[in-house]
From Swiss-Prot:
Location of the protein in the cell: Cytoplasm
Domain notes: The TIR domain mediates NAD(+) hydrolase (NADase) activity. Self-association of TIR domains is required for NADase activity.
Alphabetized SMART domains for the sequence: AAA
Reactions the enzyme catalyzes: NAD(+) + H2O = ADP-D-ribose + nicotinamide + H(+)
Encoding gene, per UniProt annotation: CHL1
Protein name: Disease resistance protein CHL1
GO molecular function, one term: ATP hydrolysis activity
Keywords noted in UniProt: Cytoplasm, Hydrolase, NAD
Domain TIR positions: 16-170
Domain of life: Eukaryota
Species for this entry: Arabidopsis thaliana (Mouse-ear cress)
Length: 459
């Protein structure tokens, strides 16, 4: 594979959904507010269009972030003039809002007005559309209860409150989707028992494990949204790489702004240790023994009643790291998988009778994995029987033994069509042929393709 192809594949695999799009008319408070959201486990995209004083198209990266976001926060201040970049971006944000794909939350740092007189005089041809957009933004402040007028109030406290409210919107908007809710009650009942939230005499640590794409992170984020209000500090770590070195460095760092800019969650975690606070810490994607052991050792310094959850594909890693209990997130049961697939393929809980046999084949092809069920169901939605038969045969032949990597690559493509699916499969095939397969990769592939179906029989 060429270096360009390798880079493209890597970027696709690393692509992540954005929860909240941040658009500020000035740089005031934007870094502080972004850090609050990140500490609440919210994935953000911070736009710097406010710095642009000339006209220019919205970049593809910015557009993609808007398409993926559930919420856009637009922060304004009368003490700072609105820039061309901010106003042009606002027009695009409101287009997404009018289509119903984006919730817009205005935050007024001073009062319900805007510093735009000078820029409107400079660009009279754009002034009408800009003023209309700003009027819509003002109206949204009354329409949405999360919007706040911060004039004369303590901005720090209110920004923290808004961040907490946004976290509920983000987490629960996903939970209201039948795809997210399926099997969640079953998982949560066991996890609640393991967490034993009523016990405040110790720091409890649990591990959540399972194959790639089975829904470990979805479950962890659901847990986070359900219980974070019970803790003084709460942190959801998407990336624990080099966590030990970074936190040890932050322990001796006197300037908290350096801590936050270097590692968004480092300050919260070290403060919880220093001040013996009750913390909820969830660490996703723990993939080596040193990471797990060090997190468990570090957690001993938190206040009694704290809860630490480690997420990994490797059960032995979690046990050897020293977690008290482990829970396996298995692939969906047959009826659950069929319900998730039908939601995306037919917009109803179960398939029509004339598509039932094909739907069952598709569920097996997706490996009972939520990610695969969503992508394959969305792709087949609206197609006729002949198209289903042809697509399922072609996908089964093309899929080979690396279903999870193909699903991840497919998830990152804008158009979930068969051509893009085949391209993703080709990338994985070339990647595998250009390197030796490690024992771990073979085990993961076998678990996904074979073990999943056998696990269904055992449940």
């Amino acid at each position: 594979m060429s270096s360009a192809s390798s880079s493209s594949a890597a970027s696709l695999l690393l692509g992540r959904e954005v929860d909240v799009f941040l658009s500020f008319c000035c740089q005031t408070s934007h870094g502080y507010f972004q850090n609050i959201l990140i500490r609440n486990g919210i994935r953000t995209f911070l736009s710097y269009r406010c710095l642009e004083k000339r006209f220019g198209p919205i970049g593809q990266r910015t557009l993609k972030a808007l398409e993926e976001s559930r919420v856009a926060v637009v922060m304004t201040s009368t003490t700072k003039p609105c820039s061309v970049g901010f106003l042009e971006e606002l027009l695009v944000i409101l287009e997404f809002q009018e289509k119903g794909s984006l919730m817009v939350i205005p935050i007024f740092l001073t009062d319900l007005s805007f510093n735009v007189e000078e820029i409107c005089r400079q660009h009279p041809e754009k002034a009408p559309s800009w003023r209309t957009a700003l009027t819509k933004l003002t109206n949204l402040a009354a329409e949405y209860p999360l919007s706040q007028n911060l004039a004369g109030m303590d901005q720090s406290d209110l920004l923290n409150q808004i961040a907490r409210d946004i976290s509920l919107v983000v987490f629960y908007s996903g939970s209201n989707d039948s795809n997210a809710l399926v099997a969640m009650d079953r998982h949560m009942k066991v996890v609640y028992d393991l967490l034993a939230l009523e016990v405040n005499k110790e720091v409890r640590t649990i591990g959540i494990w399972g194959s790639a794409g089975v829904g470990k992170t979805t479950l962890a984020r659901y847990i986070y949204a359900e219980i974070f209000v019970n803790f003084q500090t709460h942190v959801f770590l998407d990336n624990v790489e080099n966590m030990k070195d970074k936190l040890l460095k932050f322990e001796g760092e006197e300037d908290p702004t350096v801590i936050i800019s270097s590692y968004h969650d480092g300050h919260e975690i070290t403060e919880a240790r220093r001040k013996h606070r009750k913390i909820l810490l969830i660490a996703d994607d723990v993939n080596n023994m040193e990471q797990g052991k060090w997190i468990i050792e570090y957690a001993n310094w938190f206040a009694p009643g704290s809860r630490v959850i480690l997420i990994s594909q490797n059960k032995n890693l979690l046990v050897d790291a020293g977690v008290m209990d482990v829970y396996e997130v298995r692939s969906l049961r047959y009826d659950e998988a069929l319900q998730v697939f039908s939601h995306f393929a037919f917009k109803q809980p179960y398939p029509p009778s004339d598509f039932e046999e094909l739907a069952v084949r598709a569920v097996h092809l997706a490996g009972f994995l939520p990610l695969g069920l969503r992508l394959l169901g969305s792709f087949l939605a609206g197609k006729g029987r002949e198209e289903w038969v042809a697509a399922l045969l072609k996908l089964k032949a093309k899929q080979g033994g690396h279903i999870m990597e193909v699903w991840k690559l497919m998830e990152a493509t804008d158009d979930k069509g068969l051509e893009e699916w085949e391209t993703a499969a080709d990338i994985v095939e070339r990647k595998e042929s250009s390197q030796d397969k490690s024992q771990q990769e073979s085990e993961v592939a076998a678990d996904i393709l074979i073990g999943k179906e056998s696990s269904q029989d055992k449940q």
